[in-house]
Amino acid sequence: TRAAYAGRQKYTFGWTGDSGCSDGVTKGWAQMENQIAVLLSAGLGLIPFTTTDISGYCGDIDDYPAMAELYVRWVQMGAFNPLSRIHHEGNNAVEPWMFGEQAEGYVKDAISLKYSLLPYIYSYAREAHDTGLPIMRAMFLEYPYDSQTFSTDNQFMFGEELLVAPVVK
């Protein structure tokens, strides 16, 4: 949902907004990295169910090969969001096969990984519902006595057990 209201944190999924990278692939990388901070901030604000536009909502794609790695990396990072949804603006699609056979294979692997994690995600979703503790966790939530975790902003814990360090450059 775009809107916020009392109880949102318990019953709905938030969305980080149109991240946009229509100025080119270079801006798209920065936007993907920025989404990590936005998602973690939402969790720290007791909104544990938040997601992003996987693929960056990047406008018309003129050069699929140039966009392929960013698309794959965004899908891989998005597999570790509480909700994964590929969403795009513009007049063309962002289906995995449009980025080439190799990209399609990587995306298939990321989606398969997400499905294999569903029992894990369900357990942490229940915990989030009951306690407000987010599934995507800033490093310092799990390691509060490690001062380096307070300046780590491009990786996160997914639940207690999984460290996620997306490729963002």
Model-derived segments and their meaning:
Residues 1-169:
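Catalytic-domain carbohydrate-binding cleft regions of carbohydrate-active enzymes
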